Curated annotation (Swiss-Prot):
InterPro entries to which the protein is assigned, alphabetical: NAD(P)-bd_dom, NAD(P)-bd_dom_sf, UDP_G4E
EC identifiers of the protein: 5.1.3.2
Family classification: Belongs to the NAD(P)-dependent epimerase/dehydratase family.
Metabolic or biological pathway: Carbohydrate metabolism; galactose metabolism
A single GO molecular function term of this UniProt record: UDP-glucose 4-epimerase activity
Gene that encodes the chain: GALE
Keywords: Carbohydrate metabolism, Galactose metabolism, Isomerase, NAD
Entry protein name: UDP-glucose 4-epimerase
Binding of substrate, residues: S133
GO BP, sorted A to Z: galactose metabolic process
Length: 350
């Protein structure tokens, strides 16, 4: 157990992965300070975190409304508290939107993060867990994806993650006292087992499971399946889906590594299950979990979508002592539990 006196700053903490990670941080005895600008999230998510952990642990949680692009917001936060490490989730993540509006992505994802590094350095907080993505592998030439593969990005969102990885490597190389872990997520799905926390995207979902979920509760008429002629077992694309609670535990493992490993430098780890599931397999699993029929519309492939992507998890298992515990069945069970209890997400209304 890590001493509970350690204080962690979590940026973008009201988002899907942020909320679930904050719950696990509190459950593991950390003091947590969170900052979010609610660009793509809501205050209700923070209230639900408090509800899930209970009143005792909630006392170890502080919230600040703020934006990383405003350095004053960060200055105030770091002047008020001494942080032992930062988990940095804040950023925009919709591929399609990034293609249409790349400047918005460069402003949010790059400027915000550069400000964060500057203020961290000024206040001598030099331990960071960074939220990267499997998008940095682009169209991988072979699978599974191993951390030392050549990196490439297929869109502006992916490029921001790639740039930010490179920035992290450059900073750590120039200032070796920094310890940075880059976590490359594959496809986070599922929800907290309580049914009180889950993914609540604004507008039409960009990811498969929230889309399936919205069809199941009647918010959308059908699921668009992009590509049904891939050279896979059922013609649909294959991805590595990982339960969000496994992902949250991966962040705890990464933090422990930062605190215990002096020579971590700047190191990347995949967080996935190491197994691929097709779109149609995920639909079938969700239908089984929910008892609902999901209407499908077969559409052409989207440009830039890879046929099959899944993680090699050997490095995270060996060096972080972390391994995904949940399978597709549990992912769909928990996703449906969240959906049926919150058909309209956190707002509770259309």
């Amino acid at each position: 157990m890590v001493a509970s006196s350690q204080k962690i700053l979590v940026t973008g903490s009201a988002g899907f992965i942020g909320t679930h990670t904050v719950v696990q941080l509190l459950n593991n005895g950390f003091n947590v300070s969170i900052i979010d600008n609610f660009d793509n999230s809501v205050m209700e998510a923070v209230e639900r975190v408090r509800e899930v952990v209970g009143s005792n642990l909630s006392q170890n949680l502080e919230f600040t409304l703020g934006d990383l692009r405003n350095k004053d917001d960060l200055e105030k936060l770091f002047s008020k508290s001494k942080f032992d490490a930062v988990i940095h989730f804040a950023g925009l993540k919709a591929v399609g939107e990034s293609v249409e509006n790349p400047r918005r992505y460069f402003d949010n994802n790059l400027v915000g993060t550069i400000n964060l590094y500057e203020v961290m350095a000024k206040h001598n907080c030099k331990k960071m867990v960074f939220s990267s993505s499997a998008t940095v592998y682009g169209q991988p030439e072979k699978i599974p994806c191993v951390e030392d593969f050549k990196l490439q990005a297929m869109n502006p969102y992916g490029r921001t993650k790639l740039f930010l990885e490179e920035i992290a490597r450059d900073i750590q190389k120039a200032e070796p006292e920094w310890r940075i872990v880059l976590l490359r997520y594959f496809n986070p799905v599922g929800a907290h087992e309580s049914g009180k926390l889950g993914e609540d995207p604004r507008g039409i979902p960009n990811n498969l499971m929230p889309y399936i979920q919205q069809v199941a509760v009647g918010r959308l008429p059908e699921l668009n399946v992009y590509g049904h002629d891939y050279p896979t077992r059922d013609g649909s694309a294959i991805r590595d889906y990982i339960h969000v609670m496994d992902l949250a535990d991966g962040h705890i493992a990464a933090l422990r590594k930062l605190f215990t490993s002096e020579n971590i430098g700047c190191t990347a780890y995949n967080l996935g299950t190491g197994r691929g599931s097709s779109v149609l397999e995920m639909v079938a699993a969700f239908e089984k979990a929910s008892g609902k029929k999901i209407a499908l519309k077969l559409c052409p492939r989207r440009p830039g979508d890879a046929t099959e992507v899944y993680a090699s998890t050997a490095k995270a298992e060996k060096e972080l002592g972390w391994k995904a515990k949940y399978g597709v069945e549990e992912m769909c069970r928990d996703q449906w539990n969240w959906a049926k209890n919150n058909p309209w997400g956190y707002s509770g209304k259309p």
